[in-house]
A protein has these predicted regions:
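PAPS-dependent sulfotransferase catalytic domain
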Residues: 5-6, 11-252, 257-282
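Short, functional N-terminal and low-complexity linear motifs
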Residues: 63-64, 100-106, 127-132, 204-211, ...
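A polyampholytic, Gly/Pro-enriched intrinsically disordered region
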Residues: 125-135, 194-209, 301-310
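PAPS-dependent sulfotransferases, especially Golgi type II membrane carbohydrate sulfotransferases
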Residues: 1-74, 216-228, 235-255, 262-350
Length: 350
């Protein structure tokens, strides 16, 4: 016979977790069709660069719920918007800027979306992937406060699902954030072996999702240098961004270069305030532009001005100048041959 006290207690836990955005929908387990939730209130988000197992507090509370149960008990979804990015382009900085009580909360690379990408690449049924993705957005879109929007910055590994996410949420808007190619290549080179390994891992994932319209075969990719692989991955993301702009239009999707974001933070935040419909007053936007999101290092939590950022870039560029120059010229030729613009349309700031 069913213990009614157990049922009541279980239902209470389910409701408490599903209703509270401080319970982060952290991981998806397709084997059990379950969502792993982890306690991550606003102050934890502020101390965490990315919402990964390595960075979230190891001793925080955790609970596993059936996906269907969690979604059924979730509250109405907040306005949900996205920052899709090419990596190494100040996206973490920008996600931090949207932690604004009363207006919005920024989520920095929630891993549940990466789990769905991995499941998809392992051959999951597309219909099931779409359903779980929709439910993941529902759980990530729980509001942290009354009237607040949620701005999700997925990992760039998730970019292949960007069109599906925007299609599922017709009211959502997106910023497509990128670094200029030379800056991106300098960032990869500065990371040494790990940066060069990362771009090859990105390439493997992009090829699995059919995101390379360049006509190269496996021998071509094997013959490319690490920075050529980095450049071709950057171009693949630019091609995808152009497709998103063409499909969803400038009313919903805008693009922004990281150098413009850093040089004009007030203008960028004002335009994003309008794009995402956050209704922040001019003085609030100005406070964000002059605040820690733009004046402290997003990963090291130390003072880091626009001048410091420029000096760091110039130092990395100088060490690899010849290779970066040659690879940039090669990438421009590849882009021209494939009909890909090096500067995507629908700029956020005109």
């Amino acid at each position: 016979m069913c213990d009614q006290r157990h049922v009541s207690r279980t239902n209470t836990v389910l409701t408490d977790v599903a209703q509270d955005a401080a319970w982060l929908a952290h991981r998806y387990d397709p084997g059990h069709d379950a969502v792993h939730f982890q306690w991550a209130p606003r102050d934890v988000h502020r101390r965490t660069t990315f919402l990964t197992d390595a960075e979230l507090p190891a001793d925080s509370r955790k609970i596993v719920l059936r996906r269907a149960d969690a979604v059924a008990a979730a509250p109405s979804e907040a306005p949900l918007h996205f920052i899709f990015h090419s990596a190494y382009c100040c996206s973490t900085l920008l996600a931090r800027a949207f932690d604004r009580e009363g207006h919005a909360m920024g989520l920095k690379e929630p891993v549940i979306l990466n789990d769905i990408v991995g499941w998809r690449r392992r051959g999951a049924e597309p219909r099931n992937v779409a359903m779980v993705l929709d439910h993941a957005l529902r759980l990530l879109g729980r509001p942290f406060g009354a009237g607040e929007a949620v701005v999700v910055k997925p990992s760039n590994v998730v970019n292949g699902l960007a069109a599906a996410m925007l299609g599922m949420r017709p009211q959502s808007r997106a910023l497509l954030l990128y670094a200029p190619l030379e800056t991106y290549l300098a960032s990869i080179a500065k990371k040494g072996m790990w940066g060069r390994l990362w771009v090859r891992e990105l390439l493997v994932g992009q090829l699995a999702e059919g995101l390379h319209p360049f006509g190269f075969d496996q021998k071509d990719y094997l013959g490319q240098t690490d920075l050529q692989v980095a450049a071709i991955g950057w171009l693949a993301q630019h091609a995808l961004f152009a497709q998103l702009v063409a499909r969803f239009g400038a009313e919903r999707v805008r693009t922004l270069g990281s150098e413009t974001l850093v040089a004009e933070p007030a203008a960028a935040m004002s335009a994003l305030n309008d794009l995402f419909g956050l209704d922040m007053a001019a003085n609030e936007v100005e406070a964000i532009a002059n605040g820690p999101a733009f004046t402290r290092h997003s990963k090291l939590d130390e003072d880091f001005s626009a001048a410091d950022r420029q000096a760091e870039h110039l130092s990395a560029s100088a060490m690899h100048a010849e290779e970066i120059e040659k690879v940039t010229a090669w990438a421009a030729a590849v882009a021209a041959s494939a009909g890909i613009s090096m500067a995507p349309g629908a700029p956020l700031i005109r």
